[in-house]
Amino acid sequence: MTPYRPEFSAAEQSRIDAEFSRLARNKTVYLDHAGTTLYAENQVTAAAEQLQRNVICNPHTCRLTGDFVDQVRFKILEFFNTTAEDYHVIFTANATAALSLVAENFDFGSSGDFHFCQENHTSVLGMRERVRANGIYMLREKEISGGGAKENGTVHQVSGKTGNSLVTFSAQCNFSGYKIPLDSIEKIQNYGLSKPGKQLWSALGDKKEHTHNDYYICLDAASFVATSPLDLRKYRPDYVCLSFYKIFGYPTGVGALLVSRRGAEVFQKRRFFGGGTINYAFPHAMDYQLRETFHQRYEDGTLPFLSIVGLLEGFRTLERLVPKTDEFSTMERISRHVFGLAKYVEDQLRQLQHPNGEPLVELYNKVGYQDKARQGGIVAFNVRTESGSFVGFGEIACVAALHGILLRTGCFCNIGACQYYLGLDEDALDSIYKRAGRICGDYFDLVDGQPTGAVRVSFGYMTTIQDVEQLLQMLRSSYLATKPLQRIQFIEEQAEQLPPLLKERVQLLRPKLLQMAIYPVKSCAAFKIESPGSWPLTDQGLKYDREWMIVDMNGMALTQKRCTELCLIRPVIKVDQLELQFGDNSHFSVPLSLEDQAADSAKCVSKVCRQPVEGLDCGDAVAQWLSENLGLEGLRLLRQSGQRNSSKDQQKLSLVNQAQFLLLNRSSVRSLQFEEPLDETVDRFRANIIIDTGSAFEELTYKALSIGGIQFQVEGPCQRCDMICINQRTGERSPETLTTISRLQKGRMRFGIYITRIPPDTKDLEPKEQHMTCGDVVIVE
């Protein structure tokens, strides 16, 4: 592990710290510089003094304002090591507005295509809606980094080119900090693309004519230029989009589009003009003339001149606080500083392990932190529990905020990068955003235990090694030294200190009742209650649970150990009927009312777990239906009619084997890592109550709990047999379920816990019927 080496001298660091004293006063650690960096205190003081000293007004009124704006244009070009001979500077509201300007005005000709990188900011995806291209394609990063379609070392020249294709990508991914090699720019401009990417739309439908176009590059540099030098003499993209608040912290509301001379040639005549962009426009005729100067044609209306003037102090502040040296420029030094911090954080995170050796975090990057030319000052990760389950990024945001740490969570307006780094296929994205209902910017962080986003920390020139040590200490103390319930209690106790959105997230930290499964007929399939459904409880458990059973000709209970096809009988509880279904076309109904059935039924006795059980025979018709579908003679359907108590503590039981309820934790099931769908594995365990704590096998430590205010006592773990080897949807056996549990539990066959409802303490003659509802909060006591 490489030790951290500071880029700045002690004197330089002291000067920087003095400019950001508000962080210490507010006890804040700021780690979201990819969102925006922070302004220096003397920077805004100097900007205000400049406004107080000068009369700065509309540039059409005052020449001084125009001179200031021209100074800023010159300074921007100098900052990127270029001149007005090579690039125009168009002021925009931000990088997004710059991208929109390119999309609206780029001339694709008759055959040009729009290509964009998957790992791009949402604003680049928005360009798809405005470009007038022949086709729209999504490129993988490697299809850009691989360079152009070079043939035999010569430029691929084709006569008669009819179109202009635009390739848009980020110089630095704002999700991971990965930097696409900038030498790809010239290669693509000269040789085109070796592969067009995935076609999303074409004016020709599925058919694509293989035409040869000129290629232009639009570089989204917003994330990159905040902490890295961009040399436009060395790399010459046709369009560069950026926001200045990313670089200076202040002012906001001003960005720029830099357009090369080559890029200007394919900017078409605009469909709109605003004030300041024309020489004249007649009201009585469709006649107008645009300005001669290129940038003036695209700067509609009055510029945000006060913000633009404020940029001068931004440039001066960087040069003052991070002076260039004989070896490195200001931005090169900032790049070295943030990269050094990111490398240190990544090294430290890799060392963090749970007591069982499992890593605390999962990191998301492509090439590691070996070369600042390929990786910037961003670290993206998710936290894992000791069992390997993911901790939701919303919880991390809460814990960090309560420790005074500001960081970013989610997908960071870059769903494509989220998809790539989290390994989400197209169906998974549909599941997260369309079916589960996640939206950009929310704290809906886990879907079926899998993360929908990540935690991101990013650094600026004012970030210190002490800042990152506080981050690391927060992770150690909160996720290596405490249990999940301790964290939840800590967050709940401090919740009033959180911002509104995170307060809402606190309500989601406690596990909830996800699903209830009623098994009306012992050993047959489940009747499931999903959110927001509710279900009544009786003295014996969930109403109608294991109230019927199938017996053979000897009166012995039939189970899946003898007849796996029982799982194919699907009970459906209706208003007054229990309908039994087998396959798509065979079904039979019996009455739900015990009184209705008792009048016509013969009494009989069977056994469950060696205990006698009184029951009512449900008749010959259903018996024949069962025998025909299961292929066994002499079957009967019995319904429990008498009270049955457990031998241990006289709790009232239905036809269950051991306790009123069996509780299962989906996180524990997820730890098995079977290839089959998770829901199918959950079904194997035939539990009544399904929760998800986010931490595997946490339930084995419970002594008591409440669900929606209903109290339960834990009877102990469920000792498993080979019944769980049966796939409850097909009836097929597979032994790996049992062997995996044995391995995870070190030879013990425990999975799920038995629980019993504690009767409510009431003196009412007719106590109120209790219901459980999917979504009820689970509180462990």
UniProtKB/Swiss-Prot annotation:
Catalytic activity, as annotated: Mo-molybdopterin + L-cysteine + AH2 = thio-Mo-molybdopterin + L-alanine + A + H2O
Active site residues according to the UniProt entry: C413
EC number: 2.8.1.9
Pathway: Cofactor biosynthesis; molybdopterin biosynthesis
An example molecular function term from Gene Ontology annotations: molybdenum ion binding
Gene3D superfamilies (UniProt xref): Aspartate Aminotransferase, domain 1, Type I PLP-dependent aspartate aminotransferase-like (Major domain)
Gene Ontology biological-process annotations: Mo-molybdopterin cofactor biosynthetic process; molybdopterin cofactor metabolic process
Broad enzyme group: transferase
One Pfam family linked to the record: Aminotran_5
Family: Belongs to the class-V pyridoxal-phosphate-dependent aminotransferase family. MOCOS subfamily.
Name listed for the protein in its UniProt record: Molybdenum cofactor sulfurase
Source species of the chain: Drosophila erecta (Fruit fly)
